[in-house]
Amino acid sequence: KKYIIWATKFGSIDNTFIDSTTGEKVVIPDGVAHFLEHKMFEQKNGVDSLYVLMALGLDANAYTTNDHTAYLFECTDHFDEGLDELMDYVQNPYFTDQNVEKEKGIIGQEIGMYDDDPGWQLYINAMDCLYEKNPIKVDTAGTVETISGINPEMLYKCYNTFYHPSNMVLTVVGDFEPEAILAEIKKRLKDNEARGEITRIY
């Protein structure tokens, strides 16, 4: 079996940061990191990369936490095809007014499900009591109200800030020749230029 996970250090706590291109402080609504994760699978040609990976027989998924977002799959066959798809969709976001508005309804339903989950509500309320101002208390998905303010420009700004190899970690586990798999990954990287550290404000 082979396993790969590609994670970016961008989670629900990263809702205030400095735009490296303008030097201005950027404040984003709660739930943007999770929203961005949902939208990454949709490609410009209408294809959903998650379905492409599943059609190859791969067990693929993605998730968002307080401090990172990750895209992953595991398989016994078709690893190279899966690697192509993973590195393609993570490096080629496609956001439009239409597909962002559509996603708000989908995530809104997901938020509603968690609102009805007593265990999750217990956790969120405990975090709210433990942390007065720290963004770790924020629900990863945000709220219906906060995600209503998300737009394509905001998603692209966050993508361009946080989805860069210098802020990401790619881990591969399995029967690989280290030099060979590293070469294959480097061939697929679009932008590998070094960047300065991201200035986050908490």
Located regions from the model:
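His/Glu-rich zincin catalytic helix
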Residues: 1-48, 156-202
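Acidic/histidine-enriched segments that form metal/cofactor-coordinating
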Residues: 44-158, 179
